[in-house]
Amino acid sequence: MFWFFFKSGEFFRLKETRAKLIGGGKKLLVPFIVFSFLGYCLNVYNLLKSGDTNWVHYVLTPVKELVLGGSIAGNDVLWFLTSLFMVQIIFNELKKRNVKSWLIVIVAISIAVVCHMFDITKPAYLANVSMGIALYSLGYMLRDIQYDKKIFGVAFAAYIAIMLIEPSHIDLRTNTLNENGCYILALLFSICGCITVNNIFKHIPHLPFLTYIGKNSMDFYVMHMLVLGVITILPWSEWMIPNSVVFGVMCIACLTVPAFIGYLLEHSRYSWVLGKTNK
């Protein structure tokens, strides 16, 4: 997720607050609401199937999950959409007030570091939005100079060195550091990783398959957990299907089902559910 915040920052354009709210709402919040509801329905089915009759788990728990974590069970990976929306709005407001990008990075990272040091995990978006703003600002600042050979060389060397000497990485959603990792090195590792990945993909041939996934990433992102959720409901063990086959089905389904449904939606009046406008 580090890369997605970083990459989004490269495309930042200053806009009026109202335009930013409406545009971000259509592209991010609408898919979040629609596919969170579908995930909620899937989770309700699983709760009923397990015999859970506690109404709290159906009504209050999702609200608590949303308020504290930014998403709900059934499709909880969608936290990124709400966090990115907040990142875009906050960064836009800061730039309207001419706040320096480097200052935004320092303050935002400091907030995330403090959250880590004092184990402040709730609400989760306090840390991940702060980190997201830092990455978004870095993407904006480095959108052109990251492709300088010297900068790429330093970033690549640091990325490999940290990976080999002291592997450190952060779960961006929860701001959790891996065991025996170093938080500062994890930040450096992630930032250098973003620069490295961008440079690699800039110089390799464009592959139609990867290009398609990149252009339709929202389709795959909002649907893949629903696809996996439906697959896990099926009684594979009763059918005596090997786990390796089930895994293969999951992989194929996650690539084909979102693409198929996304195509149908994009060419219908319902393209808005994916944050797209009908062509």
Pin down the residues of each PLM region.
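Alpha-helical transmembrane segments and their immediate juxtamembrane cytosolic regions
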Residues: 1-279
